[in-house]
């Protein structure tokens, strides 16, 4: 009986350095300082018999979240998107509602290592945003 389970790689990043600045990215001639888009990944997934991938944010902006969701809508092998939203914003619920309407939002993440406030998670506005 053939294996009917899908293989999903749960963490890939796509970026377009002409759209957003990625301050964490090393300066040229870094191998990272170029666009990484679906065409860069498609053959690798096929060669390794991976059926789908999940895109994970590399920039802390809703603009990038929409960019990744645009890609997800147009790319069959993208199973979902892990995006960033400002959990401390009073509008976080509305922003999440709009992103969820896009269809492939599967999670959100906050990069705590980049947050100067070590107590970020225990702040009242963060707790409110997580609810």
Model-identified regions with their sequence ranges:
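An N-terminally biased module of ancient metal coordination in phosphate/nucleic-acid-related enzymes
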Residues: 1-72
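Active-site gating/metal-coordination segments in enzymes
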Residues: 63-131
């Amino acid at each position: 009986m053939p294996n009917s389970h899908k293989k999903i790689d749960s963490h890939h990043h796509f970026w377009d350095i002409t759209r957003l600045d990625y301050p964490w990215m090393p300066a040229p001639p870094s191998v990272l300082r170029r666009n990484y888009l679906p065409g860069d990944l498609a053959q690798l997934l096929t060669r390794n018999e991976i059926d789908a991938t999940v895109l994970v944010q590399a920039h802390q902006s809703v603009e990038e979240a929409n960019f990744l969701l645009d890609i997800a809508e147009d790319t069959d092998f993208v199973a979902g998107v892990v995006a960033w939203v400002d959990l401390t914003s009073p509008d976080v619920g509305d922003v999440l509602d709009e992103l969820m309407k896009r269809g492939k939002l599967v999670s959100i993440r906050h990069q705590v290592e980049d947050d100067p406030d070590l107590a970020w998670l225990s702040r009242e506005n963060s707790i409110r945003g997580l609810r």
